Amino acid sequence: MTIRRLISTSIRATIISLLLVLTAAPASAQLKFFALQKDSIPVFRGFSVSFDMVGAGMALFGDRGQYEAGLRLNLHDEWFPVVELGYGRADCEDEVTKIRYKTSAPYFKVGIDRNMLKNKHGDNRLYAGLRYGYTSYKANLSRPGLMDPTWNWESDYNVQDAPCNMHWMEALIALDVKLVGPLHLGWSARYKFRLFHKDGDFGKTWYVPGYGINDSSKFDATFNVIIDI
């Protein structure tokens, strides 16, 4: 077992164990975990919108990437339900095989973050969170024709609009730093792993919108511009 696979397995086991512990814990303990701090601050504290700059940069200047925006509700500066919507794309040709892979599709993620700092109402926040993601996309593969030396005709390879989809989870740690007024900057490190997936009949797809390179698990990062509203 490689070090990367060992780390991925350990993280996945930890996440599942925590979920099982929360599920099996007495109702009083569960309520205590999800309870808000008691003070004079109102429960609803507004919401914010965010834009991921890493994925946008990759999409603009590379052969794959995504444009992603998020909406985050603020409940008492402690709990933050999140919806993230995006559009991922890839257009890449292998230098050796000359096989070209192309896809583009929208995706969504829903989840929740918790502010882990003791001072919940400060300007900066440290989040731990979970996401569930889904996308339905179509994959296209093509390769230039090759001349068959025996029959002396050209043989090509072409797959168009093969239907695919994927469900996945993300566990994340994120930092939110206030700059000035409603403007924040945010960084997140994410561990992603597949739940269910359907590849095309031709085999494993190379890139999945919103998930990235199609492995059973992977690490990822975001850099966000955040505006409080």
Model regions and ranges:
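Gram-negative (and chloroplast) outer-membrane scaffold detector with strong preference
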Residues: 79, 84-152, 222
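Residue-level signature of outer-membrane beta-barrel architecture
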Residues: 73, 114-116, 175-177, 227
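Transmembrane beta-barrel strands of outer-membrane/channel proteins
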Residues: 47-55, 83-87, 128-134, 187-193, ...
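Short glycine/proline- and aromatic-enriched beta-strand/turn motifs that initiate or cap beta-hairpins
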Residues: 27-74, 84, 224-229
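Predominantly the C-terminal beta-signal and adjacent terminal strand-loop region
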Residues: 171, 178-229
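Residues that define the transmembrane beta-barrel architecture of outer-membrane proteins
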Residues: 45, 63-67, 104-108, 124, ...
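Short loop/turn motifs that connect adjacent beta-strands in outer-membrane beta-barrel proteins
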Residues: 31-45, 78, 117-125, 179-185
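Extracellular loop and loop/strand-boundary signature of outer-membrane beta-barrel proteins
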Residues: 54-57, 94-101, 155-161, 208-213
